[in-house]
């Protein structure tokens, strides 16, 4: 009951309003505010009133402008970078090593036989189109050549270049390896290009190269990709270099290790790669002390004599340092170690800590990235490299209907090959050169908020020396093959020393350049400096704004009611009827004394007594008027709120 009464009083108070007009409210505010200036506007003479009004208006505008600048600066989410140094025992990084050649030529030669013969014929026609000493003629399988051939472009007349096919004598899918007919261009006057055509052959593009070496290497790699994509990965692993052949010796600190301490993964570019201290199944190994004596020492046998001649032109080992449980993108971030040398790598650690939303677009674990991570099968952490490659593979599947061999294969998809997807090379070339595709993937992928980078200082020296070369190679050969029949040579061994230079690590951390404390202090400082105000002054100003809105709403409601009343008066002309008029409109004429009512003939019932006729009508109260139902009378306690 009390709550209902209290709510009713509150409703009456809302309907009544502040009880001031606009002018009275402004005068009250100027007299009572703690802000300097408004009080002088109403207390001084006319000239000073105008002066103080202009000054107050100017400084108010200046404060609002400064507030806008500070708020815009705060909403720009700028960061400041701090660099700090630390010293502690650190976990040794994961080390990935690969051979520069992905496969042993002795094991893949049967797959590349036709391609190698075609490659030799291509080189003959490029290098000696008219003066070849090849007397024997052999038949070549040019089925793969028909999909992506190499051509010579004669640009002696730049306005009308001439395209010459290297195998102009192709008939029924085969070609002779003898030189082609004399051409009007030589190797100095022509450029080698790769012709890529769509499925029906109506649209063709030419990928130009500045050197014939680049052209034939890219062409051979494209054809080899087509071949290896049709071989099961289990067989490819067997054709690559096994760990027991690649890793001859291993030492971590003072503890010996072997190839069994490495985790094997298959990389499409480098075949079998081996990761030390990956941390997938065991705890990461710490480094006891900085210095070369407490790092990882490896001796590798790259087996250069068994390299694929046209697939790999670089000899050595490829290695990369990375975090535990992260996938090694060794093609993009790795370095080469040259054969016949001892490569020493000193490591310094940088830790990056980025601010997340809204300061940057980084992600903690990649769960908020709208790209399917194709490297999740390796159970590795998120990285922007994995995201970009997964995004490219998705676009490859959408545009070319097949997946590229160099990237993980999604479930239910197939790798591209010439037999099932004849125009995949044309589609892949366009997609790889597409700027829109790269921008799409870069915008969709995010950097990792926390990252560790390993800065390397690399030095090299010949190893072994001429004085110790014989006995070292004999000992290594005996340890590897348990016999001295096979002797290693300088061109096939690589020695690596990987160690921490020092235990000092750098932490590069982002922090908010402008936080909420900075914003409030600057807003308050500007307001206090220019107008002598504080937070209470803002509350006072907010109060008067609420009162202004309150009065405006009451006036609008009253105006709406007056419009409704005017419409009602226009519909029913004249004053409303009185109670007496309403009663007369419904009078029962049986009660009227001056109206004779027909009755029975007196002669019929002579002895019947005649009763008086009741004719007293209700009184006519002309003073009673009908009251509108929507009018609510305020009680005497309405102002008590």
Swiss-Prot record:
Keyword Transmembrane helix: yes
Main location: membrane
InterPro entries: ENaC (IPR001873), ENaC_chordates (IPR004724), ENaC_CS (IPR020903)
Disulfide bonds: 98-273, 185-190, 197-204, 250-257, 362-449, 387-445, 391-441, 400-427, 402-416
Reactions accelerated catalytically: Na(+)(in) = Na(+)(out)
One MF annotation (Gene Ontology) recorded for this entry: ligand-gated sodium channel activity
Gene Ontology terms describing biological process: multicellular organismal-level water homeostasis; sodium ion homeostasis; sodium ion transmembrane transport
Motif (PY motif): 617-621
Family according to the record: Belongs to the amiloride-sensitive sodium channel (TC 1.A.6) family. SCNN1B subfamily.
The protein, known as: Epithelial sodium channel subunit beta
Gene this chain is encoded by: SCNN1B
